[in-house]
Amino acid sequence: MRSCFPDVQSADPQIPAHLTRVGISGIKKLVKIPRRGKRSIVLVSTFNLFVDLPAHQKGIHMSRSHEVLQEVLEELEMSVEGSDTVIEDLCSRISRRLLERHDYATRSEVYMTGELILSRRTPVTKLPTQEPYKIIGRAVSKRTDNGIETRKMVGAEVVGLTACPCALEMMREHGKERVKHRLMEELDLEEEEAEDLAKKIVREDVHPMTHNQRGVGTILIEVSDVHRVSINDIIEIIEESMSAPTYELLKRPDELKVTCSACENPKFVEDCVREMIRRIVERFDYLPDDAVVIVRQVNKESIHKHDAFAERVTTMGELRKELGS
């Protein structure tokens, strides 16, 4: 039906300046991902949808973006296909259709986050627990002479536990000093003899206490239709790159195990990022050299009011050169 209302968005703007991204953000949607022979996965997801706006146009037609999102989600629900990497494909389909619907735009971008719940077992008591993981999809489409070209990324954000190596070593030395002075006072030993004995008592393989942080690790990897990356693999890499995993449920034996595991594997925020990098290069050796990789770690400090941050933005090729792979 032909609209009788004026198309204000297509009018000339007062200030003819090109805008890089215009759109709608924070759209909440239920995303039902069908899987062959398995129960569908339902994600509570948030979408950000953007297109660029030419200098000669006042505004974008925002309702078109919402219509595109709804159409693609309905098509996905009717589909019989599904895989671990479907979210970046979903973002790709949305971004391409945004350019088809917004014929004045030359670039579109889709960013999606969702919460994936995975079944786990506690480390000692083996009780069932459900653990939440934030999964991320992103796609950018550009209009070119050869048609629409799209680049897409998939990733995850995982919460874990880190233990501070610096405080751990300080506590070890502090423990040796306390034991040394106790030996000198109670056994009347000379300082050198007491120091040697204290070193044997406070052994290097005994890990003292240290302060902990709740770590948040993030990996985003560029993928293509040919090269796939499993979200489960990304989650595993992030989780194993911290001092210890966290759990929604912990009985006392489990709590002891997690605490000891963290102290036995202390890591700075920088260590976590470098460990993720090493595991990415090993696990995804089939990815092309030009695949973009973003690795980030934020540790929420327990003894400071600020957080610790480390990040690497690079390509698989650069990482292979650095690690000699």
From Swiss-Prot:
Cofactor binding note of this UniProt entry: Binds 1 Fe(2+) ion per subunit.
Assigned EC number: 3.5.4.39
InterPro entries: GTP_cyclohydrolase_FolE2/MptA, GTP_cyclohydrolase_MptA
A GO biological-process term: tetrahydromethanopterin biosynthetic process
Catalytic activity from the UniProt record: GTP + H2O = 7,8-dihydroneopterin 2',3'-cyclic phosphate + formate + diphosphate + H(+)
Site (May be catalytically important): 164
Enzyme category, top tier: hydrolase
Pathway linked to the protein: Cofactor biosynthesis; 5,6,7,8-tetrahydromethanopterin biosynthesis
A Pfam family that the UniProt record links to this protein: GCHY-1
Any one GO MF annotation of this record: iron ion binding
Keywords: Hydrolase, Iron, Metal-binding
Family assignment from sequence similarity: Belongs to the GTP cyclohydrolase IV family.
HAMAP family: GTP_cyclohydrol_A (MF_01527_A)
Subunit structure of this chain's protein: Homodimer.
Free-text function comment from the UniProt entry: Converts GTP to 7,8-dihydro-D-neopterin 2',3'-cyclic phosphate, the first intermediate in the biosynthesis of coenzyme methanopterin.
Family annotation (PANTHER family): GTP CYCLOHYDROLASE MPTA (PTHR36445:SF1)
Listed name of the protein: GTP cyclohydrolase MptA
Naturally occurring in which organism (per UniProt): Methanopyrus kandleri (strain AV19 / DSM 6324 / JCM 9639 / NBRC 100938)
UniProt lineage: Archaea, Methanobacteriati, Methanobacteriota, Methanomada group, Methanopyri
